[in-house]
Amino acid sequence: AGQVHVLYNLCTHRGGRVCREKSGKASVFQCFYHGWVFGSDGGLRLIPQEGAYPAGYRNERDRGLVSVPRLENYRGFWFINLDASAMSLFDYLAGAKEYLDDIVDQSEIGMAIVPGGQNFQVDANWKLWHENGMDPFHVHSVHATYFEYSADVLKVGKEKAQASGVSTEAFDTKASAEVMMKGRYAALMQTKTKLSFDLGNGHMAYNYPSTHGRPFAQWHPSWDARYKPELDQLYDKLVARVGPERARRIAHFDHHILIFPNLAIVDNHGIMIRTYFSKKPEEMLVQSWTIAPKEESAEIRKLRLYSYMDFLGPAGFGTPDDVEAIEAAQRGYKGAEDYDGWNDISAGLAPKDPMNFVKHGDEGRMRVFWTKWQEYLSN
């Protein structure tokens, strides 16, 4: 098996960029400036006109590409750390490891990155994206169009499914909202799955029963009934592999995980891996990928990508709405120079009631991030 190397894209001769492509295959890398050649492990392979240099020049010191200080892997997720003395990745991930386990264990043989990705700029401070990712209150207002669309698709899908003899009784929503909320809470408690909680080290997550179906082991009437047998079979295999309780948590619940400070993993319409880096105080670069089980059939992969792009894609119902909301907030801050207030994230500080989160939402997960951020600034 090969090895993974992460190297600074910096020629050790005169600082040129050694690799100018975002992705691809190569056995060696040649700096375009003076033609120095390096191997995929970073080792120096060739110096043009080496005879012009002093004797022993190549061996005076390591002139290969420089590796990052720390590179660690947890279940196929690779993390770079620029602090050589920092705690181990295993310890840093803390409670987030359980969520990564649940994602990876959706496959019997491992997950793979689906070719392609999305890179886009957002004209706002990067921390606003973090807030938005854990915000329960914006969903039905910002994404109202998506819910209207989903209701129409579900109605048509149920009619088609029933006409083909597939029961959709489990997806009827005649019960009152209060009964539905209580059922949702009870379902979480039945699987010992918390709604929202601190995972340690600034990481956080929240879970909720999926209402839209999942392209892994949970069919939904908004999809063609031909997908149901294979999705049901996937669920049965998952139960046999990890047990009924964990299978239900993995397959029937959506999960949002934020790993401090700037990694988001959203497991709902598909599995989205997203990073967001500050370019300047009012500008960030967002990068997104999706992963899927290696053994997934072509039909289910097609369904997965449709589901993913429908909401999470760059032209989907979700991402453009979120970008507009975040950028509008940033414009508001900039325009109100006399405003000395703070972003209010006090929801959830009301007297504790197990049903409060289900009824109203909770901004506690945002406070987890800001508490850790304040700790870093203080130190």
Whereabouts are the PLM-identified features?
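Rieske [2Fe-2S] iron-sulfur-binding domain
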Residues: 1-98
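C-terminal catalytic domain of Rieske-type non-heme iron oxygenases
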Residues: 69-379
